[in-house]
């Protein structure tokens, strides 16, 4: 009887998903049609032209306060970024894999977060900076090496991999169990979210990349980072999507407001950057350098890739 009931439930779910995926008004159906009918010069190939991509790095320095003008580092579309874009565009054209990912995402979104689904499927990798951009921002050479890195909210570890050649020991934290699995496959030492503050040692570099707007207590997080950072040569590399829209992701894709609010003001990228020195000062940091970079994510059937505007800072303790 239980087997029959389970079979009926599965059948009903399959019918519902099929109707959802293949209705003539469905974005999935339209995307499939575009993939089948467009050639190499069609909409998918045309997405994200070179001229548009260069706009990702533009900063109006005249709108920055004087102290920030002095530490701004101009970045550019480089080879490492272009390789990520090319790979993402290629993957988005793998039609049957994208169909499979879409089906699995539809089913698993009922009881898993989008982050965990991506970790399970091994898709949706993020890109914050290339090796060259990382080195220019920290003012280090390719051979520079130090002892200990902590990457908070490391996701699948692809960004960690870019930083890892410069460190002898690499630690990471992550909430998603499937992302932890991805990190462990890369041989990184995964610490619990309440463990990294209590290891008894300090970190030479702590990365906090696009995490402050997705955690419940961003102010507490900044202060915890300060408490375990090596006090003289230690640095924090912190990325933040601007304009700032904080929320906390829960199972089923539900969004909640964080319990702590960062006082970030302004309507555009430059105005919001101007309010951040005071936010960092309250946590015990000053800005040593910063840049504007695209926060990229691998695409799917609908887009070759996704992009948001990042401000990436190097912070030093005071």
UniProtKB/Swiss-Prot annotation:
Keywords: Endoplasmic reticulum, Glycoprotein, Methyltransferase, Mitochondrion, Signal, Transferase. SUPFAM superfamilies: S-adenosyl-L-methionine-dependent methyltransferases. GO terms for cellular component: endoplasmic reticulum; mitochondrion. Glycans are attached at residue 35. GO terms for molecular function: protein-L-histidine N-pros-methyltransferase activity. It is found in: Endoplasmic reticulum; Mitochondrion. Pfam families: DREV (PF05219). It comes from the Eukaryota. It catalyses: L-histidyl-[protein] + S-adenosyl-L-methionine = N(pros)-methyl-L-histidyl-[protein] + S-adenosyl-L-homocysteine + H(+). Its EC number is 2.1.1.-. PANTHER family: DREV PROTEIN (PTHR12890), PROTEIN-L-HISTIDINE N-PROS-METHYLTRANSFERASE (PTHR12890:SF0). Protein-histidine N-methyltransferase that specifically catalyzes 1-methylhistidine (pros-methylhistidine) methylation of target proteins. Specifically methylates the second His of proteins with a His-x-His (HxH) motif (where 'x' is preferably a small amino acid), while exploiting the first one as a recognition signature. Catalyzes methylation of target proteins such as S100A9, NDUFB3, SLC39A5, SLC39A7, ARMC6 and DNAJB12; 1-methylhistidine modification may affect the binding of zinc and other metals to its target proteins. Belongs to the METTL9 family. This is Protein-L-histidine N-pros-methyltransferase. The gene is METTL9.
């Amino acid at each position: 009887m239980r087997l029959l009931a389970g079979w009926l439930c599965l059948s009903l779910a399959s019918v519902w998903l099929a109707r959802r995926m293949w209705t003539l008004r469905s974005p999935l159906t339209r995307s499939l049609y575009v993939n089948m009918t467009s050639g190499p010069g069609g909409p998918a190939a045309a997405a994200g032209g070179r001229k548009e991509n260069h706009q990702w790095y533009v900063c109006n320095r005249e709108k920055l306060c004087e102290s920030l003008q002095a530490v701004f580092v101009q970045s550019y579309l480089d080879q490492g970024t272009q390789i990520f874009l090319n790979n993402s565009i290629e993957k988005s054209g793998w039609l049957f894999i994208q169909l499979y990912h879409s089906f699995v995402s539809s089913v698993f979104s009922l009881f898993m977060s989008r982050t965990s689904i991506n970790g399970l499927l091994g898709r949706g990798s993020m890109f914050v900076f290339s090796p060259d951009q990382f080195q220019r921002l920290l003012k280090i050479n390719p051979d520079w090496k130090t002892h200990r890195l902590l990457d908070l909210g490391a996701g699948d570890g692809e960004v960690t991999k870019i930083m890892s050649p410069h460190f002898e020991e690499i630690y990471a934290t992550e909430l998603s169990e499937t992302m932890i699995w991805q990190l462990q496959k890369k041989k990184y030492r995964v610490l619990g979210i309440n463990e990294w503050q209590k290891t008894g040692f300090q970190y030479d570099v702590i990365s906090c990349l696009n995490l402050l707007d997705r955690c419940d207590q961003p102010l507490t997080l900044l202060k915890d980072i300060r408490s375990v950072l090596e006090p003289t040569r230690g640095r924090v590399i912190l990325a933040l999507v601007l304009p700032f829209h904080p929320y906390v992701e829960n199972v089923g894709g539900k969004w909640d407001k964080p319990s702590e609010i960062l006082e970030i003001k302004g309507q555009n990228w430059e105005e919001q950057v101007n309010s951040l020195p005071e936010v960092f000062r309250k946590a015990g940091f000053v800005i040593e350098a910063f840049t504007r970079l695209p926060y990229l994510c691998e695409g799917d059937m609908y887009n070759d890739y996704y992009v948001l505007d990042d401000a990436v800072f190097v912070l030093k303790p005071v």
